[in-house]
Design a protein with these regions (language model features):
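Ser/Thr/Gly/Pro-rich low-complexity, disordered linker/stalk segments of secreted
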Residues: 2-38
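Acidic, metal/ion-coordinating pockets
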Residues: 34-264
């Protein structure tokens, strides 16, 4: 999360990757009859961007969306891996080329790159609450935040199931979004009037319970969890609201024992 004024441009966001060897266990064979399709042994590669702040055009130190799209296309073309493409927030507000359309032009660019999911960052509210809601309509993939509420109801979808191979059971990914409660002070207060940001750890654990209860009722068992956390890392950020604290808390969640979780 960054300040409420136009976002800094000191560090370009580039796609980062993580593989099963470090982050996520390979999918286990489903306990189904022998004739059911089984997942192949593949690495999982997560390409993630965050805090791009409207950097659509390539310049020194900035990859730009054209080259970003090429990287995504090249990774998805690799048949020996499963590729997820996600964004951890603050994608739209920042540079004039994006601000001129209130970020809507860049939202459409992300659609062209076919992202799998995105978390809500504090700067997604910089053009007002109505515009933040509008992003949900423009984007063709889920915009996630499990801890953003209006009138006691979640404003955004809390989680999504990403299934890269619908013919294979057991290789789905549960993606959960969470937004920094600092949003209340890191965008203009008028932009989040009536919006409540609840505790990240409590809310993510609640979503895990919700997802697993629904999965059990449907006879499913999701083994991979990815948390897109737009949380602060500064010393001024309360410890309970930091991404590192969330990662530590999830590692102790008994519901996730024997599973793998990646916090981005």
């Amino acid at each position: 999360a960054t300040s409420a004024t136009p976002a800094p441009v000191e560090s370009p966001a580039v796609p980062e990757t993580s593989t099963t060897s470090e982050a996520i266990a390979p999918a286990e064979a489903p306990s189904a009859p022998a004739e059911s399709p089984k997942s192949e042994e593949k690495d999982t590669v997560i390409l993630h961007t965050n805090d791009v702040h409207g950097r659509i055009v390539e310049e020194k130190g900035v990859i730009g969306d054209a080259k970003l799209a090429t990287v995504i296309e090249q990774e998805r073309a690799k048949t020996n891996q499963t590729t997820l493409v996600v964004d951890a927030g603050d994608a739209f507000q920042g540079l004039p080329i994006s601000n001129s359309s209130k970020g809507e032009a860049r939202a459409k660019i992300l659609n062209e790159m076919d992202y799998d999911a995105m978390a809500v960052g504090n700067h997604e509210f910089d053009f007002g609450l109505d515009e933040a809601k509008k992003y949900k309509e423009i984007l063709k993939f889920p915009l996630l935040s499990s801890n953003t509420y209006v009138d006691g109801a979640r404003l955004f979808q809390a989680s999504t199931i990403v299934d890269k191979n619908k013919d294979v059971e057991g290789d789905e990914f549960v993606v959960i979004g969470v937004t920094t409660p600092e949003t209340a002070t890191k965008t203009h207060p008028k932009n989040v009037k009536g919006v409540t940001f609840t505790e990240p750890i409590e809310e993510v654990n609640k979503v895990v319970e919700e997802v697993q209860a629904k999965a059990k009722a449907e006879g499913k068992d999701y083994k991979h969890y990815v948390v897109l956390a737009h949380l602060g890392v500064d010393t001024t950020t309360p410890v309970a609201w930091r991404g590192s604290t969330l990662a530590e808390a999830l590692s102790k969640n008994p519901l996730l024992k024997g599973k793998r979780v990646t916090v981005i």
